[in-house]
């Protein structure tokens, strides 16, 4: 993957040179072996990425490979660099010893993420299932690219169930010819998502609620997309959305469920309509629309992306309704996983940390400042 992506490769030890020789040189740049002298100095320049294959680590003693590699190398990681460790899913381990070693990788990566975060660098763990090696192209390119700038300390699974094999993905305008639906597209994360997908070649259908026509239409004109105004909680919303997508575009390839609301109060002070609105917009409408799309509107090989939240994982003071709805989204994705795999489709939930949007701007100042500093990078993200 790295050779095909045009990396300027430095490898750990002479024996690793063969791997790059077999893959072919990266645009005429042969791999260079790294060595460390007795004083711990490395014969390599500042590096943008550090990648360690830990899939074969099977005991606590073998975890020393993490120290042996990262102890001398981490000091040479450049600003906004990338650290990636490859591992295996712990549930597939052949023994308790292997399971312990593979589980240890997650704690290591999360800690490294905090250590390198102050210079804008990130660290990720790719858990590659047996037989899924041919599917790592996309995930590995993503975590090493600028697209993952605000993703850090995360274990990411690579499954053998479905996916696109190495080399079959066009990396210039990869979404060319695709139709993408983005809900809540008028501003914030939704607008940024719509712009990115259009930049990568997709025709983006910008969906937002009636009342946001001006902002939504302006965005659609800017990116060459189209507009679909609908209240996602309306009883006929699933039918209206599906009919519009089929009539205008013949279906849809990508759906980003971004529309959401917050109605914050402690459970003791919360009005019932606050509870109902957060649950219905963030979870109920998402479920109904997804089920409708799967009845003939979503094309083969389709992709569902659901916006969850850190609040859905860890909970949050004054957000029982919001946290419940976003945890529900995660449960929905887990349910869909098996159902969609047989159709060549995928479903993933994204739980953003603190993103600077209109919603987070309404959070009290001290809570807002604390939230910005809680993640590995120690800062808020931009949509």
Predicted features along the sequence, with ranges:
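Canonical Rossmann dinucleotide-binding motif of NAD(H)/NADP(H)-dependent dehydrogenases/reductases
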Residues: 1-12, 172-205
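Conserved glycine-rich Rossmann-like NAD(P)H-binding loop of the short-chain dehydrogenase/reductase
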Residues: 7-20, 202-216
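Catalytic Tyr-X3-Lys loop
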Residues: 43-76, 80, 84, 98, ...
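Active-site helix of classical SDR
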Residues: 101-105, 290, 325, 333
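Alpha-helical segment proximal to the catalytic Tyr-Lys
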Residues: 114-115, 295, 338-339
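A conserved structural motif in NAD(P)-dependent oxidoreductases
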Residues: 128-136, 375-383
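Residue(s) in the substrate-gating loop at a strand-loop-helix junction
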Residues: 309
């Amino acid at each position: 993957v790295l050779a095909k992506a045009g990396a300027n490769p430095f490898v750990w030890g002479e024996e690793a040179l063969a791997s790059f020789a077999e893959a072919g040189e990266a645009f005429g740049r042969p791999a260079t072996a790294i060595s460390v002298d007795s004083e711990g100095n490395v014969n390599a320049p500042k590096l943008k990425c550090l990648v360690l294959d830990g899939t074969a680590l099977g005991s606590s003693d073998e975890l020393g490979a993490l120290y042996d590699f990262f102890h001398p190398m981490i000091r040479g990681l450049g600003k906004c660099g990338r650290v990636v460790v490859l591992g295996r899913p712990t549930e597939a381990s052949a023994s308790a010893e292997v399971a312990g070693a593979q589980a240890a990788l997650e704690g290591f990566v999360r800690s490294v993420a905090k250590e390198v975060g102050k210079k804008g660098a990130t660290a990720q763990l790719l858990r590659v299932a047996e037989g899924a090696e041919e599917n790592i192209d996309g995930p590995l390119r993503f975590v090493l690219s600028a697209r993952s700038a605000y993703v850090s300390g995360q274990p990411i699974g690579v499954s053998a169930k479905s996916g696109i094999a190495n080399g079959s993905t066009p990396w210039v305008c990869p979404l060319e010819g695709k139709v993408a639906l983005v809900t809540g597209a008028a501003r914030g994360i939704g607008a940024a998502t719509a712009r990115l997908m259009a930049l990568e070649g997709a025709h983006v259908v910008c969906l937002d609620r009636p009342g946001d026509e001006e902002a939504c239409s302006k965005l659609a004109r800017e990116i060459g997309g189209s507009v679909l105004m609908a209240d996602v909680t309306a009883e006929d919303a699933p039918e209206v959305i599906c009919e519009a997508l089929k009539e205008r575009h013949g279906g849809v390839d990508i759906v980003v469920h971004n529309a959401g609301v917050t109605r914050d109060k402690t459970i003791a002070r919360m009005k019932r309509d606050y509870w109902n609105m957060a649950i219905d917009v963030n979870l109920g409408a998402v479920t109904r629309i997804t089920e409708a799309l799967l009845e003939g509107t979503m094309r083969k090989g389709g992709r569902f992306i659901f916006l969850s939240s850190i609040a859905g994982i860890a909970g949050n003071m004054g957000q029982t309704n919001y946290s419940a709805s976003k945890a529900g989204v995660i449960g929905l994705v887990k349910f869909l996983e098996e159902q969609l795999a047989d159709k060549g489709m995928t479903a993933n939930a994204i739980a953003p940390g603190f993103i600077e949007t209109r919603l987070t701007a309404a959070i009290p100042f001290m809570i807002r400042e604390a939230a910005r500093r809680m993640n590995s990078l120690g800062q808020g993200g931009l949509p």
